[in-house]
Design a protein with these regions (language model features):
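C-terminal alpha-helical "lid/dimerization" subdomain adjacent to the S-adenosyl-L-methionine
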Residues: 2-9, 13-27, 146-206
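Conserved alpha-helix/loop element of class I SAM-dependent methyltransferases that forms part
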Residues: 28-47
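A generic alpha-to-beta junction signature in SAM-dependent methyltransferases
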Residues: 41-43, 66-67, 141
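Short glycine-dipeptide loop
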Residues: 46, 141-147
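Class I SAM-dependent methyltransferase SAM/SAH-binding core
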Residues: 50-107
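A short acidic, Gly/Pro-enriched loop at the edge of an enzyme's catalytic core
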Residues: 106-117
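A short SAM/SAH-binding and catalytic strip from SAM-dependent methyltransferases
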Residues: 117-129
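A short glycine-rich, Lys/Arg-flanked "PGG" loop and its adjoining helix->strand segment in the class I
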Residues: 131-143
């Protein structure tokens, strides 16, 4: 297996020593992307927030600073990521402002209408059934709540060679903005707004239940 294939597989489900390196790198390399992605998103200080695919836990940490009277939950299906994210957020966990747990987007372990905001940063490429998974996200989101998707890649002619290679090697589903909007609309999301940074191939999608 090539080095790029190994890395993309670790992005899907980071594990072991290589996974820890990848997660630590993502905590740093995704900082600017996440800053741009979150700048448009309202986070009230009493919000209940769920970050799906929390990885190393830095995005959870940043949102917990804004929801300082609420709580931010981080979910990842990698047991190792859960452990690393707990370590990164231990002080906030002790203050009951953060909770990290193992879970999958196919069956989010919360009641309906739970969260004010749900985020997915650099993760939906790997979701097994995107339409069903978006429906599950919508189930646990409060009516009027916000679902935010932040991606470093979307289907684009400018980046088609790179993205096609990554999709094939990493078994990634890289959607176009139009495809993403259609699927979200079909499962019942509304007020769908998509912003792009075309020269970087960045995408931010914000929608409501």
């Amino acid at each position: 297996m090539s080095e790029i294939a190994k890395r993309l597989n670790q992005c899907r489900k980071p594990t072991g020593d290589l996974g820890k390196i990848v997660v630590e790198d993502m905590n740093e390399s995704h900082f600017n992307l996440t800053s741009w992605g979150l700048e448009k998103i309202k986070i009230e200080n009493n919000f209940l927030v769920l970050d799906i695919g929390c990885g190393g836990g830095k995005t959870v940490n940043r949102m917990a600073e804004r929801a300082d009277q609420g709580k931010v939950y981080g979910m990842d299906y990698s047991d190792d990521c859960v452990k690393w994210s707990i370590d990164f957020n231990m002080d906030l966990i002790k203050e009951n402002k953060v909770e990290i747990f193992q879970g999958t987007v196919e069956n989010i372990p919360f009641e309906a209408e739970k969260f004010d905001l749900i985020t997915a940063v650099e993760t939906i490429y790997f979701w097994p059934d995107i339409k069903a998974n978006f429906s599950e996200v919508r189930r646990v989101l409060k009516t009027g709540g916000t679902f935010a998707i932040i991606n470093e890649m979307y289907e684009s002619e400018v980046f088609s060679d790179r993205n096609t290679e990554f999709a094939a090697i990493g078994n990634m589903n890289i959607l176009s903005p139009e495809e993403l909007k259609i699927i979200l609309s079909e499962v019942g999301f509304n007020n769908i707004e998509i912003d792009l940074v075309e020269e970087k191939n960045w995408l931010r999608c914000v929608c409501n239940k």
